[in-house]
Amino acid sequence: MKTKAFAVFTALSVAVCSLGGAASTQTKAAPSKAAPVTIDMFTSPGSDIVNMDTNWFTKYAEKTFNMNIKWILAPNDPGTKQSLLLASGDYPAVFWSGGFTPAQELKYGQQGVLVPLNKYIQEYAPNLVQAMKTTPGMAQVMTAPDGNMYGIPQINYCWHCAWAAKYWINTRWLKELNLKMPSTPDELFNVLMAFKNHPPAGVKNVIPLDAGGPNGGAWHANLATFLMNAFIYDDETDFFTIQNGKVVFAPTQAGWKAGLTYIHKLYTNGLFSSEALTQNSTQYYGQVQQGRVGVFAEGGSNDAINYGQAGSDWQYWKTIPPLKGANGQSQAAFFGNGESNVVFAITNKATPDQIKAIMQLVNFVYTVRGTTMLDFGPQGKYWTPAKPGELGLTGHQALINVDWNTFYSGSARQNWGWDQQGPYDQSKAWRDGGVAIPATSPGGSATMLQQETVKNYAGHQPRYVFPASVWIQPSQVQQYSMLQTNINTFVNQWTDQFIVGTKDLNTDWNAYVQGVNNLGLSQYLQLSQSAMGKPFDTSSFKGEG
């Protein structure tokens, strides 16, 4: 499945609420005799779009908001093209779908290249103001330490994405071997041993536990993350935990050593192979699809399983709940900690009329209808109003029925929508508002993911986690990036070596911890603490989504 297709599928599975949104302010085009304002806009279109100039939503935006768009396109390597444009001084009035880290926002904001948006948001974009109040982490990624807002993010409120480090188990195997769903590390070990020693009838060359490598193309298929969380919090990315408001590096703590000891035990008992730490998605998914795997790591089982296909056992794959640790508590890695950057920015090349027109478009996009039209084009093409009685992901009356399966099928091309370009708002209302396919039906994998997440993962994250967006000062970016890369690379290398036994946890642990410290861990933590501001509060992420 293509990346964009998965992003829509994961957040949407098509979307409840109301098309305009009860609290939203619809932007309506006022009759105007003035000449359209011409705006240079940078964007990075997907390969599915035929032509941005003739695209239906381009024409709709131009007519509705009285503007002519001159596109600067970067379909390949947009980050490099954006940097070159900014360095040359010949940059556009608007970056519609660019990419600015907080440090870049500060850098170009302090240089006067990016225009503070505060007053324009208040004047022209009340829907965006409302979204900032209701979307966790949105204000944090938008508001720089100097109080200015230099950009706007994309919002993708994907419930099951927030707990993507999942383990999936074939419950048909459990039933055949008269086993219960494991709830602790010891119980999981016993289940895997049973799969190995007493494979179900007809299964040859069984693989009790499988996973994918970090650069293999699978989605959150890391073997260690789910397991490690039974011993210490592991967020899979920067390895930070928050203790009493302080940033702590998990991989040097005793809990990390205990987790590695357990994972090494699984390895030495032949419950997974070293390939599970490195293999690509083709190898990994192939093994699952051959029916040889009992448990596997993946954010969404639908990537590894031919969902709805006869003989694939798709209906038997269920999530293993987060394992309870020695304290009897369970926790899961959390990825809903806000957006890490912004995509939309206005530069000092923009005139007041250009700013007004483009901010009115942003305001429209920050509605359920606006985001749906931006993504898929006009009503009646790829989406229609839901019928009475059709339900959304959370079981309430749906509003929109989106044919995302056709829109994203194979190498299909279209010229109707912009397909997730720019500061769209795939909000909770948008996600919940689409007609849900029953979880046990072919094509119902998104509903299944929602249900599995609500049942087993939602609410099992720590109250406070490290935010996705942190404000590193421009003068410290290079140093911070070097520390982060060197430390995390070192940790990942030693973690794999501890797991397979080329490093010994008893004799080499102290050398490992010293190695991390020697790479500048203390300074890295100080910079992270300062840039964090305050931890991300996850308390709103619970319940039905």
Cite the ranges covered by each PLM segment.
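Positively charged n-region of N-terminal signal peptides that target proteins for export
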Residues: 1-7
